[in-house]
Amino acid sequence: MDYKNYNPRAAALAQARTLLTDAVKAAIADGTLPEAALPDFIVEIPADVKNGDIASNVAMAGARAFHKAPRQIAEAITAKLQLDGSLFDRFEVAGPGFINLFLGQDWFTSVVRAAVANPEYGRTDVGAGKKYNVEFVSANPTGPMHMGNARGGALGDGLAACLDWAGYDVTREFYINDAGNQIEKFGKSLAIRYLQLYKGEDACPLPEECYQGADIIARAKEFAAVHGDAYVGKDFDELKKAIVADALPKNIEGLQRDLGKYRIQYDVWFHESDLHNSGAVKAVVDKLLETGACYKAEDGAIMYRSAQYAAKYGVVNKRKTEDGSEEEAKDEVLVRANGIPTYFAADIAYHYNKLAVRGFDKAIDVWGADHHGHVARMKGAMDAIGLDGSRLDIVLMQMVNLMRDGKPVRMSKRTGKAITLTDLLDEVPIDSARFFFNQRESSSTLDFDLDLAVRNDSENPVYYVQYAHARICSVLKKLESEGITFNGVDGVDAAVLTDPTEQALIRLLAAFPAEIVAAADKYDPARITRYCIDVASAYHRFYNACRIMDAEGAVQQGRIALCLAVRGVIRNILTMFKVSVPETM
């Protein structure tokens, strides 16, 4: 059997639906059930295995159509169920008319064999042929990255991994905001700090709206170390241009270095400035004018009918302005009266580039939840320009609370400033950071326990799953030292694995490909970290209940296969999230 892209749970659910549908048709054909269209029905994994491996409400769903009691319908359906040659070996009718199906040992055997034989067990091809772009972090290159960027980096990279494992062609992208008001403010801040080095702070006060950080002073000093006072007497705009040209590439290199340390490798670093320099922003604005989505105001500004197009994607009562405040939604400026485009215009051009120019089937952006007001207007803009706004999906991410001794931590011990990504990675292992940030759904606020992240015991979830992997490696090494080897997957027979912990572990292993698909579909990599913890827990229960070294024959071979299967699943998950996979601890 070819185990590539094998999804045991999906196969069982699909076959159960087919068997039940065929049984209904057979019951109608012989008159046991009256002629009627079968309504939609559910096949699902019940919470309690006592209720079967697959349960269905098909009889209850058909009660109105067939004008019979659900239990009667269930008995008519099960009388026609053809289980010979299927994945199932028995059924039962339960309660008011549920039909419960029980999987046969061949299915359990196939799960173990697949998880051992396929080094990429869990990978599926549901997304084959579809190109997805995942843009995340995209921090302003004007200063250091904060905790939101730290969470967004781990979350975006984890989401991209889930999509990749579900078969999508994934591009990881960072959007460099190297144009517009932020860069103007960056240049002004740098230039004033440079002038202060020679004229003093009283002669050159730094306005409150400028960047106040020590990193700005450091960059100004670096510029002065090379150029001295050569720019003191020059035009201020010339100074700004020169000092930005010196500092901005260094900041971008710093972002790349810090994200690389965080084990994030992007496929594309896309510069906002390229959109302006290439004429892409102007082209998009012209296109919107042609469609009537934009119009020229009396002062010459080009206005976009934002509320009209955003309405279908949610309530847009307020929007965030460029200075960070909120105002009532209305027609928005895309090009100012002075001819300078707004950030929103560049953002529309950027997403048009993703979906129309580069042809991604989906563009997925990971944003902080404070940008929620921008979601509907951005999706609406895609409609306005002739694309489908549903091809743009936004993952909104809630804030991070750093905790120590049960109390919030807001300042770095080292710098006395707000904690940056670099500060975090200096304090906690990268493994912990990447795993912890992927333990909660993006829509939930995350409390990051700094004390827990450095603990080397089972309370630390990443240590817990790494230890399960290392324990398996130790078991296999001990078996090898005793001359006990695995004879290959063809000899594995799950029928001998009858202990409840063995059966539970196999069922859990079977869920891995389906969990990958669900995580990709729901943009929720936290499903996989939670699943990984469940697998580690199930393995520890199995290890404590079932002897491996002292077992014999087929039982021992089956248990060795279970060890190999669990090791492979944990290895694949940790590798997906770029967490180290130790063989000894």
List each model region and its residues.
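Non-catalytic interaction-recognition regions
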Residues: 2-109, 120-585
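Short, charged, solvent-exposed linker or helix-capping segments at domain edges/interfaces
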Residues: 110-115
